[in-house]
Amino acid sequence: LGFTFHHHPMLTYWQDHFYVLCNACPVHEERGLTEILLMKSGNGKDWSSPEIVFPHVMCKGEPTFCNHRMGFYISPSGKLLASTAYFPQSEMPPQSGSEDTGKKYFGVAIREINKDGSFGKIYFIAQNNSLYAENEFPFPYYTESDDPGLIAACESLRKDKLITLHWWEQIRPENFDFPESLTDQIVDGNRKFAKAISYYHRNDGAVVALWKNSKSALSYDEGQSWTDVVNLKTFSGGYAKVWGQKTEDGMYAASWRPLGEGSWGRYPQLWATSKDGIIFDGAMHVNGEVIRRYDGGSKNIGPCNYQRGLYEGGPDIPGKDVWVVYSMSKEDIWISRIPVPLVSSSEKYVMEDFESIKGIGDLKAWNVYHPQCATVEMEQTDEIQNMCMKLSD
């Protein structure tokens, strides 16, 4: 599209492919025409060209914008739904204060992604009926679909107390049943509340929620209720996202940006590991590049913009790696594959024979930085018929 702003990336794995969606704006965050883009990949490295899955639409003569806290849902029957939230241009707060509680969203929209790559119709799965009349919504409600399978998938999503917590700042509490420990935070002028949830299950059954603004809480009943929201002083992410998950080796991993309050930078991307999901240590650095290519408003520099991995409960992926997608300075969308177990150093001198590997992904003890315009590949030389590493720029 030629846009220079890309943000809010989301990741899932379905039908043997990775899927990523993100929002795109011409120059500034949520200014001008906005679209939601979708890409897919069979290996996580080579990606399709972006397609517009949620378009910019006009509603009653007024442009609409869209962004999201969640991007995908895979139903029990195997349907893949993409998701975003729409709001009218007139409800976009001034650039100096764009917190989501200041926007009067139409609601949360979904769209089915079919196995052949085509898209279904766009429907609202949750809408703010207290803010808008029925004829003011740009899309129909999901119950108007003629596909019983889609309706069942939407109702399954609506009943999921953990996933729908992504919506709580976009759907007014009177329209949806959210825990008071969250909704009580919505007060005038408060930007530092819990939003953009990431969660994982501990071995004792507790659900650990990690939110933007270094907030956390526990649930012992699958999101029906929560403990009081507290500040995590050691996860000093400032006004940025935190990602946490359980890894295939039975450990836990969390990613955050270490720069605290008052810093505009979102770098480096740190990860720490934990045996119990409570105490994290061994901080390691995955991506510390600070790339800025274009001008634009609300563009924090660095790779810690909306890092998101694969949520619990999805299909099994090939291998045991951790995958994380993120926005570099809210411009380019990156994805990292982190081998499990997560380690910060090699215990011995690295001796890997290029002749014994098929591709760059087979290197176990290397950190490979592989942008599209400066690729790193393994190839066979013509002269000596052996494998070498080729760096292109």
Predicted regions and their residues:
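Beta-propeller and closely related beta-sheet repeat lectin domains
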Residues: H7-M10, C66-F72, A196-S198, A240-W243, ...
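Asp-box/WD-like beta-propeller blade repeats and closely related beta-sheet repeat scaffolds
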Residues: M58-P138
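Beta-propeller blade signature
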Residues: E35-G44, S96-D116, S216-A217, P268-G277, ...
